[in-house]
């Protein structure tokens, strides 16, 4: 039996978000729908989820002592990480002391860096992956590239949204790629993964929910990336029944091995009927923002339902749908959005995240569309995103 209290009352059910970006904002909204008290934490003030939380705190989430202090102050029933850059050893301690880390502290620690999850997938679960080597110095990095061969990809073991990632075609790129990887790591300079390039037809995110009533799958989400950042996503991605079966089998093994209740974003390469594991996030995925318009329960609603111990039942997908990011480039601490009236309409929506500032290129919103086909939905979403004029 799940007992939920009322926010701001003595018996409130309290959820603490560690990371308060646009994904955390949607999780906070879903918590609010159930009367759950929300505490938003991030490294900067006025982050998107803080706008819709009951309270907020600004801390360095890589500082275990600071993390413990805010947890002891707020006494949350659920700690919900939204990002990788968190003091995961402290999360493990807090979980051992009885706190509920979503989906569990082990999953957060393993997926905090690419090494933990790659070794779990390839070496423990024996799942198909790309070839890979790890390196923690430039000389070992060069040896790893020589072993893997060209082309290959280098990534910091801990980063997100493509930061520090380079597609390497020749030896002339090595020095610059190493330096960029050292700058792009979420916890500073350090270890990298060098991966062989996988030949694939397309990539998918298989949003997978581990809940009290079993494992559930959303329809596969296709996506297009530039420099490691997602530009558009769509649902459903067409694939063969055998490939879908294999994708679900891989995703099921991964989420059950990680443990805990919640939604996981399982990234996979698909080539014909073959499926290769890429990465997993133990939380809602940015490409899954399409589910805000494509499903009866968005990935955020599913995450909240699962970690609160509620059954999922089933997931209804409405048909072809797409998302396209609003990704301006400017510098401002007073951003405005013009021409919004031309970005919305029948079966056409936008979300503006409310980020307090921009310095360069930053994702500030997303357009969402449905249509008779996925191709048309993508075009509608891209057109809508292009209509929004960002100024500052």
From Swiss-Prot:
Catalysed transformations (reactions): N(1)-(5-phospho-beta-D-ribosyl)glycinamide + formate + ATP = N(2)-formyl-N(1)-(5-phospho-beta-D-ribosyl)glycinamide + ADP + phosphate + H(+)
UniProt cross-references to SUPFAM superfamilies, sorted A to Z: Glutathione synthetase ATP-binding domain-like (SSF56059), PreATP-grasp domain (SSF52440), Rudiment single hybrid motif (SSF51246)
Keyword presence, Nucleotide-binding: yes
Summary of the function given for this chain in its UniProt record: Involved in the de novo purine biosynthesis. Catalyzes the transfer of formate to 5-phospho-ribosyl-glycinamide (GAR), producing 5-phospho-ribosyl-N-formylglycinamide (FGAR). Formate is provided by PurU via hydrolysis of 10-formyl-tetrahydrofolate.
Enzyme Commission no: 6.3.1.21
Listed name of the protein: Formate-dependent phosphoribosylglycinamide formyltransferase
Organism of derivation: Escherichia coli O157:H7
Domain ATP-grasp residue range list: 119-308
Domain of life: Bacteria
Keywords: ATP-binding, Ligase, Magnesium, Metal-binding, Nucleotide-binding, Purine biosynthesis
Pfam families given in the database record: ATP-grasp, PurT_C, RS_preATP-grasp-like
CC per GO annotation: cytosol
Residues annotated for ATP binding in this entry: 114, 155, 160-165, 195-198, 203
């Amino acid at each position: 039996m799940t007992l939920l209290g009322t926010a701001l009352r003595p018996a409130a059910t309290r959820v603490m978000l560690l990371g308060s970006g646009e994904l955390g904002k949607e999780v906070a909204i879903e918590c609010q729908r159930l009367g759950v008290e929300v505490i938003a934490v991030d490294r900067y003030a006025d982050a998107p989820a803080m706008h819709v939380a009951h309270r907020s705190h600004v801390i360095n989430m890589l500082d275990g002592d600071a993390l413990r202090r805010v947890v002891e102050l707020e006494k949350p029933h659920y700690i919900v990480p939204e990002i990788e850059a968190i003091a995961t050893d402290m999360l493990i301690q807090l979980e051992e002391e009885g706190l509920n880390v979503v989906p569990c502290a082990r999953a957060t620690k393993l997926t905090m860096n690419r090494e933990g999850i790659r070794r779990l997938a390839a070496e423990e679960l024996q799942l198909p992956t790309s070839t890979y080597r790890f390196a923690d110095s430039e000389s070992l990095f060069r040896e790893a590239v020589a072993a893997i061969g060209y082309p290959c990809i280098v990534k910091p073991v801990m980063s997100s949204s493509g930061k520090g990632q380079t597609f390497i075609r020749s030896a002339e790129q090595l020095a610059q790629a190493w330096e960029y990887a050292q700058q792009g790591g979420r916890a500073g300079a350090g270890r990298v993964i060098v991966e062989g390039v996988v030949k694939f037809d397309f990539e998918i995110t298989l949003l997978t929910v581990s809940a009290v009533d079993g494992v559930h799958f959303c329809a596969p989400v296709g996506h297009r990336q530039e420099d490691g950042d997602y530009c558009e996503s769509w649902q459903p991605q067409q694939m063969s029944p055998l490939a879908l079966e294999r994708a679900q089998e891989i995703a099921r093994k991964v989420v059950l091995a990680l443990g805990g209740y919640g939604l996981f974003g399982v990234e996979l390469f698909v080539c014909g009927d073959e499926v290769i594991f890429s990465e997993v996030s133990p939380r809602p995925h940015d490409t899954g923002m399409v589910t805000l318009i494509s499903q009866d329960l968005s990935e955020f609603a599913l995450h909240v339902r699962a970690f609160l111990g509620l059954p999922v039942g089933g997931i209804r997908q409405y048909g072809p749908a797409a998302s396209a990011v609003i990704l301006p480039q400017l510098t401002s601490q007073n951003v405005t959005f013009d021409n919004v009236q031309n970005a919305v309409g029948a079966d056409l929506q936008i979300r503006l995240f409310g980020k307090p500032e921009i310095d360069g290129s930053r994702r500030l919103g997303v357009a969402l569309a449905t249509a008779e086909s996925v191709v048309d939905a993508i075009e509608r979403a891209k057109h809508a995103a292009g209509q929004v004029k960002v100024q500052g």
